[in-house]
Amino acid sequence: MKLMLSLGSLSANSLPIEKKQQVLIDLVIRTYQSHERTELFKAITEYRKNQLIALFPEHANKSYSIIFELMDYRDLIERYPSTLSEEATLLEKVVGQCFMHWLDFWCECEIAAIKAKFPLKENELPAPQLLFEDSAYYGALVERVEDTQLMVQIPSHPQAMPLSDAITLSNLELFIQGEKWYEMLSLLSLSQVGKHFIVLKHPVQDSCPTLVASALIQNWSVRDTWLSYAPQFSNEQWNYCFPSYGYSEFTRLQLFTPSTLSKCYSLPEFDNEFKLQLSDTQAVCEVLRLTVSGNAQQKLYFLYLAQKELMSVLHQAGYKIGFTIIEQPFMLNFYRAIDAKAYFHSGYCDLNDDGKQTYRGFWNFEMMVKAFSNIDFRGYKRAVRASRKRGSLERDEHV
């Protein structure tokens, strides 16, 4: 009842949008326990997603960022009030007054909830200086982030916090707030548990290490939860493009029984054969959520450094092949400039019909380590520029 009164008062208040946003977020964080908040957000998300798909069935397979912007959110909730509860109806009404849509609000709530647990303090050491020097950083593999006692800070919030919270906050800011990958909101728990690769800046004086990059590492034993095998990423809409030398490289790596993977003609067929024939299951993993911090130039540097450290750490850990999903042109242009056997696509798809291709592919860790062994950031950027220029010339030739 107290929440209803607060929401009613806030709804009628003519506060500036930014102020109303902050008051609403604070109210929700104070009112709900973490698990209660998650259940509420998931319920309303599912309700509105199903409703929007019913209204626009031709967009059923699009991403949440497309689906939730098919209709003005305020118009949606006025024309189709929630039937979940009176509380949900009033909450959505206030959200509609100050946020683009429900998922935008969910993301901002999760970011604020973490920052509220670890508020910035006055008289703290200044924010860490992020150098463009490889030796200032180190990569590591953490088996269970939920169990580690390691406390770190991140560049956007220089306050000590558990590693799992730092990874989650970084994922929220880069992928959800920045790239609008709202599907991750209901899967935030994956950022808080399990095996993760991290890149840390060595601590200076008494400050804690700074997390500048991370990635989720999932073993073959949990392949049923892999994004690579989710229906959206393994269907007939995908263009199959696994190269002939990929089959040879897999045979050389001794991954299968029989030793040679059967020739395939579609991505779903390839996925099925891979599962049936794989015998060295310890050699395979999926790498997702490669997250980097900092401003635009720092992110490019940490993207280079994270890949360099990632390949080395996973190769040393005994992995041979890593499934991955990539949209990042900077990464793809570099891969075009190195040995083709170091990274190869298995398929590509324009998921949202917006001209942007998403690629499923494989990192061959042994070959990737070799590719990065004699290259620094300057050489990395030079290779990317040359690859981009070469690609542009090739496109011009086909016009």
UniProtKB/Swiss-Prot annotation:
Top-level taxon of the source organism: Bacteria
Alphabetically ordered keywords of this record: Autoinducer synthesis, Quorum sensing, S-adenosyl-L-methionine, Transferase
Swiss-Prot/TrEMBL catalytic activity: a fatty acyl-[ACP] + S-adenosyl-L-methionine = an N-acyl-L-homoserine lactone + S-methyl-5'-thioadenosine + holo-[ACP] + H(+)
Enzymatic class: transferase
Gene Ontology molecular function terms on file: N-acyl homoserine lactone synthase activity
One Pfam family cited in the UniProt record for this chain: AHL_synthase
This enzyme's EC code(s): 2.3.1.184
Biological process annotations from GO: quorum sensing
Keyword Aminoacyl-tRNA synthetase applies: no
Family to which this protein belongs: Belongs to the LuxM / VanM family.
Protein name: Acyl-homoserine-lactone synthase LuxM
Species in which this protein is naturally found: Vibrio campbellii (strain ATCC BAA-1116)
Gene that this polypeptide is encoded by: luxM
